[in-house]
Amino acid sequence: MRITIFLLLIILASAGAYAACPDWTPQQAQQEVAALENQLTRWDEAYWLHGENKVSDAVYDSMRQRLRAWQTCFALPVFNDAPVALAAGRTRHPVAHTGVQKLNDATSLSQWMHGKTDLWVQPKVDGVAVSLVYRKGKLQQVISRGDGERGEDWTARARHIPAIPLQVTGELADSVLQGELFLRQTGHRQQQDGGINARGQVAGAMMRSTVSSVLNDLDLFIWAWPDGPKAMEARLSTLAEGGFPLAQAWSKPVHSVSDVARLREQWFSEPLPFVTDGVVIREGREPPGKSWRPGEGSWVVAWKYPPAKQITEIKALRFAVGRTGKISVVAQLEPVTLDDKKVSKVSIGSLARWEKLDLAEGDQVEISLAGQGIPRLDAVIWRPTQRIKPVPPTARFDTLSCLYGTTGCEEQFISRLVWLSGKHVFDLAGMGEATWRQLSEHHHFEHLFSWLALSVDALKQTPGFSAQRAAQLWHQFNLTRQQPFQRWVKALGLPLPARDWQALTDDKWQQLQARDERSWQTLPGVGAERARQLVSYIHHPDIAALAEWLAAQRIDGFALP
């Protein structure tokens, strides 16, 4: 539940979870902190009073942690104790909920496991924690975790959950059980399906004033039996016999970190009957229930799954001009890690999307990885009260602009160079944006093919280039002279659809110049508008000048016979 996470976040924030403090004046810091406090209060009220998840738990946790970091940065008092105040109900737990300490990695787990025996691992089921109180064999109370000491009395709703036995016998007849109410799933793969807001659905069903049909879909995973049988095996078998079979089915003894890691990976990728967000590792023997206190469960820890999404801050916005003149927006981010990948920037897309999202520096955004591990911006979570929005370029760019390295053309010019060095054109190894920018700036490239005229000695003068690197690069550049005519036409940026290059059999520049619109339309993917563009492109003065320069370099297909 959120309350335990909230208490842990105070410690994390003070330990430097967000190392960089914002560059704010004291007055601005007070305004921003107050605004975020108000937003968190609204989320808390929706969650605790109405059972509504306005944001995911991951988003909430991140923003709560961000608030604590800002308060620490500017030595501001903590006024918002909404999670504690709202979560705490009026019904005291017979045995307090301790919560679990979250470990960051295998190294931390190894340190915790050192010297311990009789260890067990369980899926960390993602639901809502409760206490079940049985007296004389009958269900007496079901209490929400709340602040760990007190919670809400959910007994009336719990009696409508078929998965909760109303009567038990034997050692369970007078017992206190702690577990997770969860939304039952069929074949849920956490790695693929994510959290699906399962926790919010459970909380909502339990907090409604009317009986919800969702209660029929709830189940219960018992993860603690304070003062029950001392041996873990005995507790699990008694629970299973008494109508709580899941703990026995999903509790596995472990002896090493590798044992835990194997099951963690297995449960992350394989189909399960519940949503999970990690694994829990616990000692088989637990202290007496009277000693349990919130935040003091030293005998149990959690190792969560890598987050599918992260909240981070936009540090800067950059406008990039592509080779065809289209302007896109790239956000520089406070670095975060997703699936072992460090993410420090994300493409926003077009100017229109940037304007629709209303993004500015300082905004808190949610980031995930799309297909092939490409960072993706999913949502704007928080906007500061004072926002900085950069002004986009005013110059007009198109498919024919910036063939020459003139002032104001730097971005599109470099984009053209990066494109022609790709596999689909010249396939120049090691020629990324940084290298092209370095060469262009140092050697003052006049146009798109100026690099072809560089000598080995000239390349040696490039800052950071060794003699070996210069020789290798010159050799690559020189080999492009042997590339077929079509590759050079592609490098010029001729706007011909990709599927039509094979149908184009021309191998002389003069042949392309001789084509009229009707001739171009004989190619399968070229219509009237594209034909007009092609004729205009080939006869543009800048293109004609570059073709003449390539002819002077005796590039095949351009040189006159």
From Swiss-Prot:
Catalytic residues (UniProt): 124 (n6-amp-lysine intermediate)
GO-annotated biological processes: DNA repair; DNA replication
Keywords: DNA damage, DNA repair, DNA replication, Ligase, NAD
Annotated InterPro entries: DNA_ligase_AS, DNA_ligase_B, DNA_ligase_CS, DNAligase_adenylation, DNAligase_N, NA-bd_OB-fold, NAD_dep_DNA_ligaseB, NAD_DNA_ligase_OB
Keyword field contains Ligase: yes
Keyword DNA damage recorded: yes
EC code: 6.5.1.2
Catalyzed chemical reaction(s): NAD(+) + (deoxyribonucleotide)n-3'-hydroxyl + 5'-phospho-(deoxyribonucleotide)m = (deoxyribonucleotide)n+m + AMP + beta-nicotinamide D-nucleotide
Protein purpose: Catalyzes the formation of phosphodiester linkages between 5'-phosphoryl and 3'-hydroxyl groups in double-stranded DNA using NAD as a coenzyme and as the energy source for the reaction.
UniProt name for this protein: DNA ligase B
Organism: Cronobacter sakazakii (strain ATCC BAA-894)
Gene: ligB
